[in-house]
């Protein structure tokens, strides 16, 4: 929920009027409807899709305006390069750690051991589209895709990295022009206020979107679909929770704040992510709340959007854990060298994964298509439960990017500790 920092303190509204309570109630009602009337629940997918489309509609202008005004406000352009270097260094270190955690847990718990699945018996027709999407991915193709065909096409298509690329160039140009560009900067600052007010309006529909998305998930896949492969789902959830509380918790403590207080501060957004299974649905609110928590606008504008492509801790845990699950289920014994190769490939293929529903599955397909030891057809084993793991991936990704923003802001000396303390309580 967007809060106008300039507004006078208001009387605290009743609990039931908060976005947190409304989204939570919507999720519960969606689960009940999908369970009691699955045919009806399965028809409500458009509600969730429509809400995500509404949010995606506003993501491009939010990123563009925030990044441009943030860069234009930098005293020295050298600051931009330094912030980017620190951010990507953090992304690489923590993402690699997440991959290692997934690999370690899979080796210790061995969730796929004893299934003895013959690859020839698997029906891989359902993963053909994912495999094709993965095959189309390449490092060169990914880098070329960052450059839009035109300046306007980046905003029109809403690709996050393209919008970020254009915004950085535009912000640098404004900074180089200097005082003559001040009227343009002032106009963009006013547009930022308008766009975030629009975000607040769109968030009113969040409970409807969460209700439809959850009713569809339970209605189509059913609660019972978790039974056969529940071990993998439970293992992934516990691993992700442990990663957030222990790994990110330690990082947060070193940076001078509590991970639990940060999670409580972002509870509205986390419920929104849970209901829609998309961390993108809460991106505009995350940027606003990180600024309110004392992180400087240039830091927020650079770290949050890039983190949505390069700092996906939940997706990284999922990839190595799921890959080893498939190998174990198909009785493929991976040597240490093969597991290291898997980790290195996953480090590359995970970069650029979008924060939308199902992107983690495509990224896994991209990884397995490069690693010959693990059969891509084995992905058919987890296709039915991937939707249930998507929520956890998105939540972990979201918290990871919030932590990254505060950490980079602290490294840069661009963190208002008093604001952070007041926000987190």
Curated annotation (Swiss-Prot):
One of its GO terms (biological process) is L-aspartate transmembrane transport. Coiled coil: none annotated. GO terms for cellular component: plasma membrane. It is found in: Cell inner membrane. InterPro entries: C4_dicarb_transport, Na-dicarboxylate_symporter, Na-dicarboxylate_symporter_CS, Na:dicarbo_symporter_sf. GO terms for molecular function: fumarate transmembrane transporter activity; malate:proton symporter activity; succinate transmembrane transporter activity. It is a multi-pass membrane protein. The chain crosses the membrane at residues 18-38, 54-74, 88-108, 137-157, 158-178, 198-218, 232-252, 317-337, 365-385. The keyword Cell inner membrane applies. Keywords: Cell inner membrane, Cell membrane, Membrane, Symport, Transmembrane, Transmembrane helix, Transport. The keyword Transmembrane helix applies. Signal peptide: none annotated. Responsible for the transport of dicarboxylates such as succinate, fumarate, and malate from the periplasm across the membrane. Belongs to the dicarboxylate/amino acid:cation symporter (DAACS) (TC 2.A.23) family. This is C4-dicarboxylate transport protein. It comes from Rhizorhabdus wittichii (strain DSM 6014 / CCUG 31198 / JCM 15750 / NBRC 105917 / EY 4224 / RW1) (Sphingomonas wittichii).
């Amino acid at each position: 929920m967007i809060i106008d920092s300039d507004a006078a303190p208001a009387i605290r509204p009743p609990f039931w009027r908060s976005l947190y309570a409304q989204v939570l109630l919507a999720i519960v009602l969606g689960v009940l409807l999908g369970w009691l009337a699955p045919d009806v629940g399965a028809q409500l997918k458009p509600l969730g899709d429509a809400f995500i489309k509404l949010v995606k509609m506003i993501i491009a202008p939010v990123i563009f305006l925030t990044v441009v005004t943030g860069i234009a406000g930098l005293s020295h352009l050298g600051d931009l390069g330094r912030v980017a270097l620190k951010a990507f260094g953090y992304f690489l270190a923590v993402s690699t750690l997440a991959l290692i955690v997934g690999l370690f847990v899979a080796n210790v718990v061995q969730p796929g051991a004893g299934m003895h699945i013959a690859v020839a018996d698997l029906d891989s027709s359902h993963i053909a589209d994912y495999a094709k999407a993965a095959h189309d991915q390449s490092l060169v193709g990914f880098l070329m895709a960052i450059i839009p065909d035109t300046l306007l096409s980046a905003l029109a298509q809403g690709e996050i990295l393209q919008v970020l690329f254009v915004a950085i160039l535009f912000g640098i140009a404004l900074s180089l022009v200097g005082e003559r560009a001040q009227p343009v900067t002032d106009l963009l600052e006013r547009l930022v206020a308008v766009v975030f007010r629009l975000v607040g309006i769109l968030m009113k529909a969040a409970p409807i979107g969460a209700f439809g998305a959850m009713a569809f998930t339970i209605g189509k896949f059913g609660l019972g679909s978790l039974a056969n492969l529940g071990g993998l789902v439970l293992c992934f959830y516990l691993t992700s929770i442990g990663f957030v509380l222990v790994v990110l918790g330690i990082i947060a403590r070193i940076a001078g704040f509590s991970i639990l207080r940060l999670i409580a501060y972002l509870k509205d957004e986390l419920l929104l992510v849970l209901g829609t299974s998309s961390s993108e649905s809460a991106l505009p609110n995350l940027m606003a709340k990180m600024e309110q928590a004392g992180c400087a606008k240039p830091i927020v504008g650079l770290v949050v959007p890039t983190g949505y492509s390069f700092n996906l801790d939940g997706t990284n845990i999922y990839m190595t854990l799921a890959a080893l699950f498939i190998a174990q289920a198909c009785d493929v014994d991976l040597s240490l060298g093969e597991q290291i190769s898997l980790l290195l490939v996953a480090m590359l293929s995970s970069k650029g994964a979008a924060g939308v529903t199902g992107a983690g599955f495509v990224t896994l397909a991209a990884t397995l298509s490069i690693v010959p030891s693990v059969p891509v057809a084995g992905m058919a084993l987890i296709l039915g439960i991937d939707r249930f793991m998507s929520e956890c991936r998105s939540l972990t990704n979201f918290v990871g990017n919030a932590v990254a923003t505060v950490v980079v802001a602290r490294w840069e000396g661009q963190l208002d500790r008093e604001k952070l303390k007041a926000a987190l309580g």
